[in-house]
Amino acid sequence: MNIHEYQGKQVLAKYGVAVLKGGVAYTPDEAVQVAKDLGGPVWVVKSQIHAGGRGAGRFKNDPNGKGGVRVAKSVEEVKTNVDQMLGQVLITKQTGPAGKEVKRVYIEQGCDIKRELYLSMLVDRATCRVTIVASTEGGMEIEEVAHNHPEKILKVAIDPVEGFQQYHGRQIAFGLGLEGKQVNTCVKFVGALYKAFMDLDCSIVEINPLVVTGAGELIALDAKVNFDDNALFRHKDIEELRDESEEDPAELEAARHSLNYIKLDGQIGCMVNGAGLAMATMDIIKLYGAEPANFLDVGGGATKERVTTAFKLILSDPNVEGILVNIFGGIMRCDVIAEGVVAAAREVSLNVPLVVRLEGTNVELGKKIMAQSGLPIIAADNLADAAEKVVKAVKEAA
C-alpha cells in the first residue's frame, strides 16, 4: 500500500525522523492559509500523487511549463502555483503517459540546502535481509545512479537477529561523507528509520533527497513509504491513510474478491491460477507477438463466483482484444473454472476471442462443460498452443 508524501512524513516524524513543517491543502485558499501559518519567506508547493519524479514531471495542459514541485517566494506565488496544479494531470516517468490528477498539494517550509543525499530501506531478496541503501547522489533517479555509477551506491544489510546497531549508522554516515556531529545525527536518523520500517511492516522507505542544511542538520526533504498489504490487518491506523482515488479501480475491486490483479498495457487478457504460471503465460504471449493486458491470479481455491468476477475485471479494460484462460487444476478444479468461464461469458455478452487451456483435476468434465455451452470458446491443448491460438484469433478479428 502506498501513501502520499505528507502522510509518510507524518508517520516518520512520530519515530523521530527530522522533517520540515508543512500542511496539506485541497484548495488555493487553504494553501494560502497554510503558508501564512508556516511563515515565510520561502515555501515549496508540492503536488501530491502516488508517483515519483514530480519535480521533473510536466502537466498535461502545459507540457512546456513547470513541474509538480515549485518554490514560491510570496503567498501570492503559493496561490498561483496551487491554482495551476489542482485538478490538472501531472505526467512523470512513473505515471506513464496517462498521468495522475492532482487533488491535493503539500505546502512546506523552504530549506537552505547544502548537500543532497539518498537514503532508503527495503527488503533485499538476494540477502533475505532488510538493507539500507545510501548514496551521495541524492535528488536523482537512484536507478540511473546504480546503472551509471554503481560505485556510488552503498548497501548495508541488517542481521535480523541483532537488528540495527550504531555501527550500521556509522557505516552509512562515513559512506555519505558526513563529519563531526553529523555522524551521530545520522546514526539516530537511520535508527529511527529502521524502527519505523520494522514496526509498521514497510516494504520500502525512501528519502530522496536527504539533505544537509546550511546549519548542518539532516532533514528528510521527501518521503516515500510503502507498506506490505499482507500486514495491514495489524495496522488499522495505517490502512486509514489509503487514498483509493490514487489506485486503479479494477485492482481495488480485485482485492475485495481476494484476486491478485495488476493492469498492464497490452491487448491479451489473462486469467491464470498461480503467480508463476501467470508470469509464464505473460512471457509466452509476448513470445508469440502480443502483449498481456493484465496479471491475474485467481488462486488455488477460487469459486465459480470469483472466476466470474475475474472475467468481468478482464473485460472492464477497453484495450482487451482477446482472453487467454490458462488453468492447471490441482486444488483448483477444472470443472469449476469451466462453469465460471461459461457463466461470465454469458453474463457479459462476450465479444472478443476466448481461448481456454485446462489441465489437471476434472479436466475432461471441464472441457465437456465448455463444449456443451454453445459459446465460441477455443480449446487449447498446451500453453504454447493456447498463446498461438489467442494471438492468431485477435489478429483475425481485427
Curated annotation (Swiss-Prot):
Pathway: Carbohydrate metabolism; tricarboxylic acid cycle; succinate from succinyl-CoA (ligase route): step 1/1. GO terms for molecular function: ATP binding; magnesium ion binding; succinate-CoA ligase (ADP-forming) activity; succinate-CoA ligase (GDP-forming) activity. One of its GO terms (biological process) is tricarboxylic acid cycle. Binds 1 Mg(2+) ion per subunit. It catalyses: succinate + ATP + CoA = succinyl-CoA + ADP + phosphate; GTP + succinate + CoA = succinyl-CoA + GDP + phosphate. It is an enzyme of class 6 (ligase). Its EC number is 6.2.1.5. Mg(2+) binds at residues 208, 222. Its cofactor is Mg(2+). One of its GO terms (cellular component) is succinate-CoA ligase complex. Substrate binds at residues 273, 330-332. Residues 9-253 form the ATP-grasp domain. Belongs to the succinate/malate CoA ligase beta subunit family. Heterotetramer of two alpha and two beta subunits. Succinyl-CoA synthetase functions in the citric acid cycle (TCA), coupling the hydrolysis of succinyl-CoA to the synthesis of either ATP or GTP and thus represents the only step of substrate-level phosphorylation in the TCA. The beta subunit provides nucleotide specificity of the enzyme and binds the substrate succinate, while the binding sites for coenzyme A and phosphate are found in the alpha subunit. This is Succinate--CoA ligase [ADP-forming] subunit beta. It comes from Paramagnetospirillum magneticum (strain ATCC 700264 / AMB-1) (Magnetospirillum magneticum). The gene is sucC.
